[in-house]
Swiss-Prot record:
Residues 22-49 form a propeptide. Residues 1-21 form the signal peptide. Coiled coil: none annotated. Expressed by the venom duct. GO terms for molecular function: toxin activity. One of its GO terms (cellular component) is extracellular region. The keyword Secreted applies. This is Augerpeptide Hhe9a. The keyword NAD does not apply.
Amino acid sequence: MMTKTGLVLLFAFLLVFPVSSLPMDAEAGHARLEMDKRDAGNEAWTRLLKRYEENCGTEYCTSKIGCPGRCVCKEYNYNGEITRRCRA
């Protein structure tokens, strides 16, 4: 059994170093790192997709070559010539 002094020291130790400040286990740390990497990847993918969508007007398309991102291939008639271009 602990003495009163031992209990006071234990209580003081827990006040100074709470359990929540202990380092997390390896699995939780790895999961958090993976989540951070995935979020960073999603941000990069979103920026790339936005850039592709902004550049829809400069992309030509055919029946075999589609358009980037959410752009769609539309036909236009310029002075009798049919041209297919990607549009948002």
